[in-house]
Amino acid sequence: MSGHSKWANIKHKKEKMDAKKGRIFTKLTKDIIKAAKEGGGDPNTNSKLRDAIEKAKANNLPNENIQRAIKKGTGELGGANLEEVIYEGYGPSGTAIIVEALTDNKNRTAGEIRHIFDRHGGSLGAAGSVTWMFDKVGIIIVEKDNSIDEDELAMVAIDAGAQDFSAEDEEFEIITEPSNFQEVKEAIEKAGYKISEAEVTMLPKNTIQLSPEDYEKFEKLIDKLEENDDVQNVYHNVEIEDENDE
């Protein structure tokens, strides 16, 4: 029930992506459109839409933008027909990379993603080439404070169906199956705990460490992928070092 923080790599990625306000607004808007398209425009009956709206509000996306995105997703407003596309590839030293995109033009996006891989020492792979190196899981983060009883929180999470619970330096990490992610999340919230982050993500089964030279190349590749407007998420199996330890 403990071990190396799974959230560390994700948090590092999110902080870099969220630093660009315009970039995160684009991503949040697309998340809302996708959720509304898949499950309808009512957040009371569409948990994915509810989560997308919560994230948007937490990042100060204007309510007008949120409502417009919902209407685009349900078809009330005209707009581009977004499709979800998954790309798999390799970075420096054979590192595994998964790219999730939402696009209105798959040919354009595929060409751009391939170009980024090629220019930065990587290569685009076939479907299934690296996904076997990852597990799709739900991850829920509750920040530590003196009022939280670790054993009680663990019991709430495990009783609701969580796979794993761990206490890290600054937070508690709860891992779930994607299928019961929402159920566990709601049980934790109902018990009175404040969730700081919650998402379904791809966690590498094993991480690898790179030499300083390869790590620099790898970061440039990831940065360029994340700068692409169609890219929603980038997952990889590289161990992110704590910058405070360098």
UniProtKB/Swiss-Prot annotation:
Instruction: Tell me where in or outside the cell this protein is found.
Output: Cytoplasm
Q: GO molecular function terms here?
A: DNA binding
Q: What is its main location?
A: cytoplasm
Key words of the record: Cytoplasm, DNA-binding, Transcription, Transcription regulation
Instruction: Give a yes or no for keyword Ubl conjugation in this entry.
Output: no
> Tell me, what's a Pfam family for it?
TACO1_YebC_N
Domain of life, per lineage: Bacteria
Q: Which GO terms describe its biological process?
A: regulation of DNA-templated transcription
According to the record, the residues making up region (Disordered) are 1-21
Annotated Gene Ontology cellular components are:
cytosol
Q: What does the similarity note say?
A: Belongs to the TACO1 family.
Write down what this protein is called. Probable transcriptional regulatory protein Teth39_1009
